[in-house]
Amino acid sequence: MTKQILPSVIKLITPEQVLLLSEGLVAGVDEVGRGPLIGDVVTAAVILDPNRPIAGLMDSKKLSEKRLQALYLEIMDKALAVSVGRANPSEIDELNILHATMLAMSRAVAGLNIKPERVLVDGNRLPEFALNAEVERHAIIKGDGLVPAISAASIIAKVTRDEEMLQLDARYPEYGFAKHKGYPTKTHFEALAQFGVLPEHRKSFKPVALRLLS
């Protein structure tokens, strides 16, 4: 009989718990891009190799651009498995950003070429994963700064999405995506007012919706 392990949300985690949860084939999962007005929400799932440790893993938001790029390359080289999942603006508009993020996380885990024994997600919610019941799954609040596999996932997701914003900037340089990465800044609002809504904008987000009505 298959043993079912109930999912949980972990609010406080000790260093000892981090070590225990990091044993075996652990997939860390995180997202980048819930707040921007444009583009996909990007998620990543990473299974690290315990025999090839990576120093300096932490929340991607606390890393310099140079360090981000270096860690991205090291993760891609050393990890046992890396998968990126995304939800596009149409899916975000249809589902809302929370459910679209959960969908993207599910896609990231489904894309792993190694089956994890445990899935650890940053935050306080767990997606519906297409996994067997015996696979542990936990949401860890502020996990991107605590659990190495989640930190690695946050780095992969951020570098991936930032690169996509650079590509968008090359197509629409007047919007300034290289600088603000699609977030709701003054520059972005001014570009929306002057140049209008792009196909890649999230039409359900209020600043974009208001511009469509004007």
Swiss-Prot record:
Task: Supply the Pfam families for this chain.
Answer: RNase_HII (PF01351)
Q: Which cofactor does it need?
A: Mn(2+); Mg(2+)
Q: Which GO terms describe its biological process?
A: DNA replication, removal of RNA primer; mismatch repair
Substrates-to-products reaction catalysed: Endonucleolytic cleavage to 5'-phosphomonoester
Select a single GO molecular function from the record's annotations and give it. Answer: RNA binding
- Keywords per UniProt: Cytoplasm, Endonuclease, Hydrolase, Manganese, Metal-binding, Nuclease
EC number(s): the record gives 3.1.26.4
Where does the RNase H type-2 domain lie?
Answer: 24-214
Could you tell me which NCBIfam families the record lists for this protein? PRK00015.1-3 (NF000595), PRK00015.1-4 (NF000596)
Q: Which HAMAP family match?
A: RNase_HII_B
Say what the protein does. Endonuclease that specifically degrades the RNA of RNA-DNA hybrids.
Describe the family membership recorded for this protein in Swiss-Prot or TrEMBL: Belongs to the RNase HII family.
Q: What is this protein called?
A: Ribonuclease HII
**Species of the source:** Shewanella denitrificans (strain OS217 / ATCC BAA-1090 / DSM 15013)
List the lineage, top down. Answer: Bacteria, Pseudomonadati, Pseudomonadota, Gammaproteobacteria, Alteromonadales
**Gene name on record?**
rnhB
